[in-house]
């Protein structure tokens, strides 16, 4: 059976890993990733289009300076994107986030298993925890980078706008990233905290072993013989 110290520290790691799982599920399920405001003109008027969307769903609204504006629209992101580089990169972003979720799930399983068992010298021990948290943080960081690249360099919002409002001619676009996007940083922080907890446990375990060896190392030779 593991010591009380090990149980408590690995349970703490389990809670932070489970926290990252919950946060990633929230990121996947919410649509407050980004709000893009697009200034446009068309044949009879001009105004702005506001598009708020996440990985799967979004909403758009139109504000015209004059004329009759369209009703707000709900849309499926992948559903209205044609086979394009924007759609391909968006799919990669989703896959990376799902991989990060899987890695965080495995981290939570490994930390919980270590809190009730002693697979210390195998991959099921701290090495496995380090691996899964490193992968989770890497996948979610790539998710952030690729999403920003798809929006800023690949003009994802403009592509969605052109599909929703084909008559509008885009002039200028501004982006505001929402809480769903910034929660990615919380996932990375939770991954780091999990690793730090296990590192502290390993250091404490090493010092305990060193303390246990000292009485034998410094005992008189006669005492050791008899």
UniProtKB/Swiss-Prot annotation:
GO terms for biological process: sensory perception of sound. Glycans are attached at residues 46, 83. It comes from the Eukaryota. Keywords: Glycoprotein, Membrane, Transmembrane, Transmembrane helix. The keyword Membrane applies. GO terms for cellular component: membrane. Its main location: membrane. InterPro entries: Clarin. Gene3D superfamilies: 1.20.140.150. It is a multi-pass membrane protein. It is found in: Membrane. The chain crosses the membrane at residues 8-28, 92-112, 128-148, 181-201. Belongs to the clarin family. This is Clarin-3. It comes from Rattus norvegicus (Rat).
């Amino acid at each position: 059976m593991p010591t009380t110290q090990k149980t408590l520290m690995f349970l703490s790691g389990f809670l932070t890993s489970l926290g990252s799982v919950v946060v990633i599920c929230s990121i996947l399920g919410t649509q407050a990733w980004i709000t893009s405001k697009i200034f446009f003109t068309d044949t009879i008027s001009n105004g702005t289009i506001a598009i708020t969307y996440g990985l799967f769903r979004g909403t758009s609204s139109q504000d015209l300076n004059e004329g009759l504006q369209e009703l707000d629209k709900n849309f499926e992101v992948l559903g209205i994107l044609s086979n394009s580089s924007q759609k391909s990169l968006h799919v990669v972003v989703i896959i990376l986030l799902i991989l990060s979720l899987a890695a965080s799930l495995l981290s939570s399983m490994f930390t919980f298993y270590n809190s009730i068992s002693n697979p210390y010298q195998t991959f099921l021990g701290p090495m496995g925890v380090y691996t899964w948290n490193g992968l989770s943080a890497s996948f979610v960081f790539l998710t952030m980078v690729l999403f920003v690249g798809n929006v800023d360099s690949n003009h994802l919002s403009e592509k969605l706008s052109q599909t929703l409002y084909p008559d509008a001619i885009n002039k200028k676009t501004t982006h505001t990233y929402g809480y769903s996007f910034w929660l990615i940083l919380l996932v990375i922080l939770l991954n780091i905290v999990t690793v730090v907890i296990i590192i502290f446990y390993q250091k404490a375990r090493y010092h305990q072993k060193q303390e246990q060896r000292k009485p034998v190392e410094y005992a008189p030779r006669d005492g050791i013989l008899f």
